[in-house]
UniProtKB/Swiss-Prot annotation:
It comes from Xenopus laevis (African clawed frog). This is Exportin-2. PROSITE patterns: IMPORTIN_B_NT (PS50166). The gene is cse1l. Pfam families: CAS_CSE1 (PF03378), Cse1 (PF08506), IBN_N (PF03810). It comes from the Eukaryota. The keyword Nucleus applies.
Length: 971
C-alpha cells in the first residue's frame, strides 16, 4: 500500500464504516482492515491519518486502530512470519514519540500505550534511544509534553512491579535508573516549586498535580524490585516532599463530586502506597522518616470523610498502617491499649460501616459488589483495608485486640436487637468485624484455613447467623442474609459437618431469593460445600446426604437462571456443574429436562457470548450429563446428539469462535462413546474439519486434533472406504502442525492415530513423504519436545509395520540413515521420553529393532546393538532425563499475540489415555527377555557373547533379573 492520497481516503472511508452500528456495514469494513493490515505502509497510513485528518473522530479511530494493530502484530513469534516489515518498524519508531507528544490528550493516551507495547518488545536492545529522546522533553517546559512523556514512562515501567527478579530485568532497570532517575528527581523538585509559585492558579495546579501523580507512580515502579542507590542517596528530597504533599490542603483542588477522586486524593493515596512500600521492604533505611509519616497518615484518616471519592485514599492510608504494624521494628508504636482502642474506634469501625453507596451497589450493581466482596477484588476498599489492619494488629496483639473488638461486636449486636429493621447495619458491621478478627489464613479452595482461637466461630454461627438464615422470609434483610451465607462459606472448614448439613436446605431455598447477591452467594456456597474433602478420597458431603433434596436443588438452580440479572450467572452454572458431579447417577431421571434447558441456554448465549466462565461451566455441565447417562446406557448417546447437533450446527455455521473449541470437545466425547461405526451425521462433517481456516486459530487445534483422533479410532474403515480422498488433507494438517514448535506434539498425536488405525494400504504411498517431512523439521529446528514425540512415533511405526520396514524406510531415503538415527538420536535421547504409555511404546519398539531386524546382527549396524540394548535397559531403570538445552525455549499457546479464542480444556470431556499396545504386552521387561531368548535360539552363542563383552555390569544385572522373571535364558 503506497502512502498516497487515494489510500488515505480509502482507509478513512473504511474506518468510518467500522463505527457504524449496523453489523452489515461494520463487519465487512473490519474484515477489509484485517485483510490489508499485513501490507507494507499500513501502520504509516494510520499514523498519517492521526496527524493530518481534519475529522477528530477519524483521528481517534486511527489511533485506536493503530494501537490494536501494534498489540496484535508487533511481537515477533517464532515459527510465524514477521507481520510488520522492518522498514515499517523503523519508520514507526522514528516518528511515534514526536507525534504522540504533539497530539491532544485523547490521542496521546492511545499512542503512549502503543509506545509501551513496542518498548516491551524492543527496549532497550532494538530501541536504545527511546529513553534519551523522552528525557530530553523534560526540558521543554511544556507540561502537556512532559505529561505525555511521564504517562509513556509509567506504561513502560509499571511492569517492574510484577516481574520476577532476573539479571536481564535488573540490567534493564539499571539502564533506566542511570538515564531517568536524575532527570525525574529534578523534574519532581521543579514541579513542587511551580506548585508553590502557582498556588492560587487552579488551571496550572491541575496540570502540575497530574504530573506529580505520574511522578509518584514512577517512583513506585522504579523502587519496587530493590532500593536503588540513587533513591537511597536522594531519600531526603523525595520523602520530605512526599510528607509535605500528604499534609497539603489546597482548597482549589477540592472537588464537589462525591464519587470521583480528585487530583489531590489520587496523589496522596499514591504517596501512602509509596510509604507502605518503603515501610515493608526498606524499613531500616526508611526508619528516620517513619514516625512523621505515621502521624501524617493518622491525621489524614481521622479527618477524611466517608464519601466514595476518598475510598482509595483511605484504603491506601489504612494499608500503610497495616504494613507498619506487622513489622517487629515498629510494634512499640501500637502496644499501648489506648492506641489500640483509638485505632478501633476511629479507623477500623468507621471504615467497616455499610454506607449508602455500598447499599446502592448491593441493589443496583450487584455484579461489581460480588466481584469485590466475594472474589477478593476489594483490594482498594475501606472494608478490605480495615480487615487487613485488624489482621496486622493481631499478629503481635491478638489477645488485647480480640478483647477490645469483642466489646464493640457485642455493643453492635445489642443495638441491632433493639430495632432490627432500623439497626441492621450494626449487625452487618459486627459480622464483618468477627470475620476480620477470626481469619488468620485463607484460600479460595478451603475458605478460612487458620482461625483466631479466641473467637468461638460455631457459637457465633448458631447464635447470630443461623437464626437469620432460618427466617421464613427469604427476601427480608438481604444484606444480612448475604452476610450469613458468606460467613458459613468462609468458615466452612471450621464449622462442624452437622451444622453444614443443616444449612443445605436453607441454601437451596435461598436460590430463589430476589436479591442477585443472595441467590448468587447461595449457589456459590453450595458449590464450595460440594468440593470439600472428607475422609480418604471422598467429599465431605456425599450424594447420599443430598438424596432428599435432589429434585428441589436442580429445580431451584435452573429457576435461578431465569431470575432478573442472573440469566448468565457463572456461580449458578458452576453450582449446576458441581451438583451433577456430586450426584452422579441420581441426576439421570432429570436428564431430559436438564439437557433441554442447557441446550436452550446454549442457543441463547451463542448469539452473543459475553461471559466466558458461565459458558465454560455450561459446557462442563453438558459433558457431565453425557458421561453420567451414557456410562449406564451407551445407547443414550443418540438422544444427546439429537438434542445438541442442531445448536452445534448453528454455532459452526455462524462461526462463533468462542464456542467452536468447546463444540469439538463435546463432539469428541459423543463420538468416543459410539462402539460401532461412525454415524453418517459425523461423516458429513468430516471434510469440513480439514479446512485450513479452522486450523489458523490456535484455540481450535487441541480439540480438533482430538476430534480427528476420535474419527480415526472409531471409523478408520469408513474413512478408508468412503473418504480415502481426504487422507492427503489429514496429512496436510499433520504437516502444518509439525512445522510449529508450539503445536508439533499435536501433529504427532494425529500422525500416531493415522499410523495406528488406518489400514496399511491407505497410507503406503505417503509413508516416505511423512518421514521426509519429519527429517526436514529435525534438521531445521530440533527441540527436546519434538525429539521425544519423534521417538514415540518411530517405535509405534516399528510396532505397526515391523522393525525391517522401519530400517528399510530410513535407508531408502538415504543410505546408512538407519544407523545414524539409532546412533545420534535413539541411543542418546531415549532417556528423555516420559509417560508410562510412551515409555511402553518405545520399549516394545526398541525390543523389535534389537530382536527382529536382521541387519542389526549381520552388518556394520551390529556395533550399535549393545549400546541400543544398554539404552533400553536405561529407559526401564534410570530416572527420566528432563534436562533441556540452555538455548531452548518453547512458545506457549498463551504467548500468541492478539485476541484469539484460547483453548479451554473441559475437565469433564477429558479423554481417557489411549494405549495402542494394550493387553498385548503387560510387562515390556519380560517381552525383552523372551525376545532375546528367541533371538539367541536362532543364532546360538552370539547374543551372550555380545552382551558379556559390551554391556556394563549394572545393566547386565538388570537384564539377568528380566530373564529370571521371564523364566528364560540366553543360549
Amino acid at each position: 500500500m503506497e502512502l498516497s492520497e487515494g489510500n488515505l481516503q480509502g482507509l478513512t472511508e473504511y474506518l468510518k464504516k467500522t463505527l457504524d452500528p449496523d453489523p452489515a456495514v461494520r463487519r465487512p469494513a473490519e474484515k477489509y482492515l484485517e485483510s490489508v493490515e499485513g501490507n507494507q505502509n499500513y501502520p504509516l497510513l494510520l499514523l498519517t491519518l492521526v496527524e493530518r485528518s481534519q475529522d477528530n473522530v477519524i483521528k481517534v479511530c486511527s489511533a485506536v486502530t493503530f494501537k490494536n494493530y501494534i498489540k496484535r502484530n508487533w511481537r515477533i513469534v517464532e515459527d510465524e512470519s514477521n507481520k510488520i516489515c522492518e522498514a515499517d518498524r523503523i519508520a514507526v519508531k522514528s516518528s511515534i514519540i514526536n507525534l504522540m507528544l504533539r497530539s491532544p490528550e485523547q490521542i496521546q493516551k492511545q499512542l503512549s500505550d502503543a509506545i509501551s507495547i513496542i518498548g516491551r518488545e524492543d527496549f532497550p536492545q532494538k530501541w536504545p534511544n527511546l529513553l534519551t529522546e523522552m528525557v530530553n522533553r523534560f526540558q521543554s517546559g511544556d507540561f502537556h509534553v512532559i505529561n505525555g512523556v511521564l504517562h509513556t514512562a509509567h506504561s513502560l515501567f509499571k511492569r517492574y512491579r510484577h516481574e520476577f527478579k532476573s539479571s536481564e530485568l535488573w540490567t534493564e532497570i539499571k539502564l533506566v535508573l542511570d538515564t531517568f532517575a536524575g532527570p525525574l528527581t529534578d523534574l519532581f523538585k521543579a514541579t513542587i516549586e511551580l506548585c508553590n509559585t502557582h498556588a492560587n492558579d487552579v488551571g496550572a495546579l491541575k496540570v502540575l498535580f497530574s504530573s506529580l501523580n505520574l511522578i509518584a507512580k514512577l517512583f513506585h515502579s522504579l523502587n519496587f524490585q530493590d532500593l536503588p542507590e540513587f533513591f537511597e542517596d536522594n531519600m531526603e528530597t523525595w520523602m520530605t516532599n512526599f510528607h509535605n504533599l500528604l499534609t497539603l490542603d489546597n482548597k482549589l483542588l477540592q472537588t464537589d463530586d462525591e464519587e470521583e477522586a480528585g487530583l489531590l486524593e489520587l496523589l496522596k493515596s499514591q504517596i501512602c502506597d509509596n510509604a507502605a512500600l518503603y515501610a515493608q521492604k526498606y524499613d531500616e533505611e526508611f526508619q528516620p522518616y517513619l514516625p512523621r509519616f505515621v502521624t501524617a497518615i493518622w491525621n489524614l484518616l481521622v479527618t477524611t470523610g466517608q464519601e466514595v471519592k476518598y475510598d482509595l485514599l483511605v484504603s491506601n492510608a489504612i494499608q500503610f498502617l497495616a504494613s507498619v504494624c506487622e513489622r517487629p521494628h515498629y510494634k512499640n508504636l501500637f502496644e499501648d491499649p489506648s492506641t489500640l482502642t483509638s485505632i478501633c474506634e476511629k479507623v477500623i469501625v468507621p471504615n467497616m460501616e455499610f454506607r449508602a453507596a455500598d447499599e446502592e451497589a448491593f441493589e443496583d450493581n450487584s455484579e461489581e459488589y460480588i466481584r469485590r466482596d466475594l472474589e477478593g477484588s476489594d483490594i482498594d476498599t475501606r472494608r478490605r483495608a480495615a480487615c487487613d489492619l485488624v489482621r496486622g494488629l493481631c499478629k503481635f496483639f491478638e489477645g488485647p485486640v480480640t478483647n477490645i473488638f469483642s466489646g464493640y461486636v457485642n455493643s453492635m449486636l445489642q443495638e441491632y436487637a433493639k430495632n432490627p429493621s432500623v439497626n441492621w447495619k450494626h449487625k452487618d458491621a459486627a459480622i464483618y468485624l468477627v470475620t476480620s478478627l477470626a481469619s488468620k489464613a485463607q484460600t479460595q479452595k478451603h475458605g478460612i484455613t487458620q482461625a483466631n482461637e479466641l473467637v468461638n466461630l460455631t457459637e457465633f454461627f448458631v447464635n447470630h447467623i443461623l437464626p437469620d438464615l432460618k427466617s421464613a422470609n427469604i427476601n427480608q434483610y438481604p444484606v444480612l442474609k448475604a452476610d450469613g451465607i458468606k460467613y458459613i462459606m468462609f468458615f466452612r472448614s471450621q464449622i462442624p459437618r452437622e451444622q453444614l448439613l443443616v444449612t443445605i436446605p436453607l441454601l437451596i431455598a435461598y436460590l430463589q431469593a430476589e436479591s442477585i447477591v443472595v441467590h448468587t452467594y447461595a449457589a456459590h456456597a453450595l458449590e464450595r460445600f460440594f468440593t470439600m474433602k472428607g475422609a480418604a478420597t471422598t467429599t465431605l458431603i456425599v450424594a447420599a446426604d443430598m438424596m432428599p433434596y435432589v429434585e428441589l436443588l436442580l429445580a431451584n438452580l435452573f429457576k435461578a437462571l431465569s431470575l432478573p440479572g442472573s440469566t448468565e450467572n457463572e456461580y449458578i452454572m458452576k453450582a449446576i456443574m458441581r451438583s451433577f458431579s456430586l450426584l452422579q447417577e441420581a441426576i439421570i431421571p432429570y436428564i431430559p429436562s436438564v439437557i433441554s434447558q442447557l441446550t436452550q441456554k446454549l442457543l441463547a448465549v451463542s448469539k452473543n457470548p459475553s461471559k466466558p466462565h458461565f459458558n465454560h461451566y455450561m459446557f462442563e455441565a453438558i459433558c457431565l450429563s453425557i458421561r453420567i447417562t451414557c456410562r449406564a446406557n451407551p445407547a443414550a448417546v443418540a438422544s444427546f446428539e439429537d438434542a445438541l447437533f442442531l445448536v452445534f450446527t448453528e454455532i459452526l455455521q455462524s462461526d462463533v469462535q468462542e464456542f467452536i473449541p468447546y463444540v469439538f470437545q463435546v463432539m469428541s466425547l459423543l463420538l468416543e462413546i459410539h462402539t460401532t461405526d461412525i454415524p453418517p451425521s459425523y461423516m458429513a462433517l468430516f471434510p469440513h474439519l480439514l479446512q485450513p481456516v479452522l486450523w489458523e486459530r490456535t484455540g481450535n487445534i487441541p480439540p480438533l486434533v482430538r476430534l480427528l483422533q476420535a474419527y480415526l479410532e472409531r471409523g478408520a474403515t469408513t474413512i478408508a472406504a468412503s473418504a480415502s480422498d481426504k487422507i492427503p488433507g489429514l496429512l496436510g494438517v499433520f504437516q502444518k502442525l509439525i512445522a510449529s514448535k508450539a503445536n508439533d506434539h499435536q501433529g504427532f498425536y494425529l500422525l500416531n492415530s493415522i499410523i495406528e488405525h488406518l489400514p496399511a494400504e491407505c497410507i503406503e504411498q505417503y509413508k516416505r513423504q511423512i518421514f521426509i517431512v519429519l527429517f526436514q523439521r529435525l534438521q531445521s529446528s530440533k527441540t527436546t519436545k519434538f525429539v521425544k514425540s519423534f521417538l514415540v512415533f518411530l517405535n509405534l511405526f516399528c510396532i505397526k509395520f515391523g522393525a525391517i520396514a522401519l530400517q528399510e524406510m530410513f535407508d531408502s531415503i538415504q543410505p546408512k540413515m538407519f544407523g545414524m538415527v539409532v546412533e545420534k538420536i535413539i541411543i542418546p535421547e531415549i532417556q528423555k521420553v516420559s509417560g508410562p504409555i510412551e515409555k511402553k511404546i518405545c520399549a516394545v519398539g526398541l525390543t523389535k529393532v534389537l530382536t527382529e531386524c536382521p541387519v542389526m546382527m549381520d552388518t556394520e549396524y551390529t556395533k550399535l546393538w549393545t549400546p541400543l540394548l544398554q539404552a533400553l535397559i536405561g529407559l526401564f531403570e534410570l530416572p527420566e532425563d528432563d534436562t533441556i538445552p540452555d538455548d531452548e525455549h518453547f512458545i506457549d499457546i498463551e504467548d500468541t499475540p492478539g485476541y484469539q479464542a484460547a483453548f479451554s480444556q473441559l475437565a469433564f470431556a477429558g479423554k481417557k489415555e489411549h494405549d495402542p499396545i494394550g493387553e498385548m504386552v503387560n510387562n515390556p521387561k519380560i517381552l525383552l527377555a523372551q525376545s532375546l531368548h528367541k533371538l539367541s535360539t536362532a543364532c546360538p552363542g552370539r547374543v551372550p557373547s555380545m552382551i558379556s563383552t559390551s554391556l556394563n555390569a549394572e545393566a547386565l544385572q538388570f537384564l539377568q533379573g528380566y530373564l529370571q522373571a521371564g523364566s528364560v535364558s540366553l543360549v
